[in-house]
């Protein structure tokens, strides 16, 4: 069981930071286009990266184009579409591609099927697809069955359930593999990985970080293999501030009576 995270890592330690975005750095909204990362949080991320030789990356199911737009004016190393696309510290991209015919056929099937499922939404990511049902939770089972059908018919694809979404992505891509790839490269190599995420899609990342002796942090409720837990997105924001300004940590700890439980075990 994940324990409440109660002590922020020291800036002098040799850490590499990885953050999911939706539900971790930004509150989840009814539609993905409504999500915003507060500018102050982006500034904290940039400061944290600077204190760690640039060893900070965003790891998300969103595309890298979306991540760059949400992170403006800052530019971080990224893994988008659950690791199907990745950009390293030098700006070099690594992209998993599917045959164009497969993409066309899958997208056509999904679009035609979703017409009969009002309230659902198809998001095409080029090499992956997201079937959203936040506005129509009654269609969850139908979308899972549809995704299972697709992955059985096209074995190069894999199903990834998430929060009010079912993802169809290239087989073998996940956030854990993306983190592992970053950890083989400068400036991440040789550091202790820290990964913060909130969803089922983040569990592969937690597994890789745990195996490396790092710090895995689950945001919110639910079963997880993460070792630590923060209750909400605002708690992540406060934790980021503590990491960046450790001299203020004691004051924050003294203000927990507002309902924020800080950290309960030393990292």
From Swiss-Prot:
Active site: 20 (nucleophile)
Positions that bind substrate: 20-22
Names of required cofactors: Mg(2+)
SUPFAM superfamilies registered for this protein in UniProt: HAD-like
NCBIfam families, A to Z: HAD-SF-IIB, PRK10187.1, T6PP
PANTHER family reported for this sequence: TREHALOSE 6-PHOSPHATE PHOSPHATASE
Pfam families on file: Trehalose_PPase
Gene3D superfamilies given in the database record: HAD superfamily/HAD-like, Trehalose-6-phosphate phosphatase related protein, domain 2
One term of GO molecular function: magnesium ion binding
Role according to the record: Removes the phosphate from trehalose 6-phosphate to produce free trehalose.
Catalytic reaction(s) noted: alpha,alpha-trehalose 6-phosphate + H2O = alpha,alpha-trehalose + phosphate
Domain of life according to the entry: Bacteria
GO biological process entries: trehalose biosynthetic process
UniProt keywords, alphabetically: Hydrolase, Magnesium, Metal-binding
Residues that coordinate or bind Mg(2+): 20, 22, 198
Family statement drawn from the similarity comment of this UniProt entry: Belongs to the trehalose phosphatase family.
Documented EC number(s): 3.1.3.12
Pathway: Glycan biosynthesis; trehalose biosynthesis
Name of the coding gene: otsB
Protein's name according to its UniProt entry: Trehalose-phosphate phosphatase
């Amino acid at each position: 069981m994940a324990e409440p995270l109660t002590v922020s890592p020291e800036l002098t330690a040799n850490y590499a930071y990885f953050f999911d975005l939706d539900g971790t750095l930004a509150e989840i909204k009814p539609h993905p286009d409504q999500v915003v990362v507060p500018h102050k949080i982006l500034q904290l991320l940039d400061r944290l990266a600077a204190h760690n030789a640039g060893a900070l990356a965003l790891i998300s199911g969103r595309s890298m184009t979306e991540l760059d737009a949400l992170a403006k004016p800052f530019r971080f190393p990224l893994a988008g579409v659950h690791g199907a696309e990745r950009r390293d510290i030098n700006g070099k991209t690594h992209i998993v591609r599917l045959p164009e015919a497969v993409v066309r056929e899958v997208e056509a099937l999904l679009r035609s099927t979703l017409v009969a499922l009002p309230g659902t939404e198809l998001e095409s990511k080029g090499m992956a697809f997201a079937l959203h049902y936040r506005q129509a939770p009654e269609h969850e089972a139908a979308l899972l069955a549809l995704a299972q059908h697709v992955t059985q018919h096209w074995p190069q694809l894999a199903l990834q359930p998430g929060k009010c979404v079912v993802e169809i992505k290239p087989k073998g891509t996940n956030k854990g593999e993306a983190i592992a790839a970053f950890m083989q490269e400068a400036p991440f190599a040789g550091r202790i990985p820290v990964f913060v995420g909130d969803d089922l899609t983040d569990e592969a990342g937690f597994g890789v970080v745990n195996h490396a002796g790092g710090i895995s942090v689950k945001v919110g409720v639910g079963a997880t293999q993460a070792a630590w837990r923060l209750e909400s997105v605002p708690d992540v924001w406060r934790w980021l501030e503590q990491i960046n300004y450790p001299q203020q940590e004691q004051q924050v700890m003294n203000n927990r009576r507002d309902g924020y439980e800080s950290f309960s075990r030393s990292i």
